[in-house]
């Protein structure tokens, strides 16, 4: 089973990663986990003002923060794990990576910030669920 789990450095994404690892261990031999961090692009014009190198450093720092927490949660797992970082619209990038890697299951954390905020702004998890045929497990 190929499991894709999204991380952002938060406690809830660490919980989602631990859940994905547990699932992979219980599944058939050959299961693997891809740990994905997606950083949204900077606002238009920012790169022009601060420079390409500063934007690259900003994204690198964000990826490092997300993966630092993930690596701590991984410990000494026997499950094959690969880290993937990307820059783009979060939900769309998650879906693209999942499709490219022929993912069998998506595991995501939900911050549960409330129904009103979810209706007004939309959440990444609800966008992903609405646009995929891949099974999705939401961890809270």
Segments (PLM) and residue ranges:
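Gly/Ser-rich helix-loop-strand patches that form or flank binding pockets
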Residues: 96-140
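Small/aliphatic-rich secondary-structure junction motif
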Residues: 1-52
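General small-molecule cofactor/ligand-binding pocket signal
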Residues: 34-36, 82-86, 137
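Aromatic/hydrophobic pocket-lining residues that form π-stacking "cages" and hydrophobic walls in ligand
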Residues: 20, 70, 94, 128
